[in-house]
Amino acid sequence: MNFEEMMKELEEIVNRLENEDLPLEESIKLFERGVELYRKCKEILQQNRLKIIDVMKELEGEIDASGRDQENELR
């Protein structure tokens, strides 16, 4: 299951918990599933955040090494 699918399921769970009159056991199961999905989504976001930081650091290193940004050279 990818990030978007997990987020969609999580949104559906939240909607059901907020809008439906569910039995306690079903509510608890949905809540537990929601927490599981939240944790997985959070982990994916954290991993991607680190990737972005690494790419930005690499880009900054390239800019620092050349002394100027390629975009500025094109202007």
From Swiss-Prot:
Gene Ontology molecular function, alphabetical: exodeoxyribonuclease VII activity
GO cellular component terms listed in the entry, alphabetical order: cytosol; exodeoxyribonuclease VII complex
Cellular localisation: Cytoplasm
Reactions catalysed according to its record: Exonucleolytic cleavage in either 5'- to 3'- or 3'- to 5'-direction to yield nucleoside 5'-phosphates
Gene3D superfamilies: Exonuclease VII, small subunit
The keyword Kinase is annotated on this UniProt entry: no
InterPro entries: Exonuc_VII_S, Exonuc_VII_ssu_sf
Cross-referenced Pfam families: Exonuc_VII_S
Keyword Cell membrane in annotation: no
Keywords assigned by UniProt, alphabetized: Cytoplasm, Exonuclease, Hydrolase, Nuclease
GO BP: DNA catabolic process
Cystine residue pairs: none
EC number: 3.1.11.6
Family: Belongs to the XseB family.
Assembly description: Heterooligomer composed of large and small subunits.
Record function comment: Bidirectionally degrades single-stranded DNA into large acid-insoluble oligonucleotides, which are then degraded further into small acid-soluble oligonucleotides.
Protein name as it appears in the record: Exodeoxyribonuclease 7 small subunit
Organism: Thermotoga maritima (strain ATCC 43589 / DSM 3109 / JCM 10099 / NBRC 100826 / MSB8)
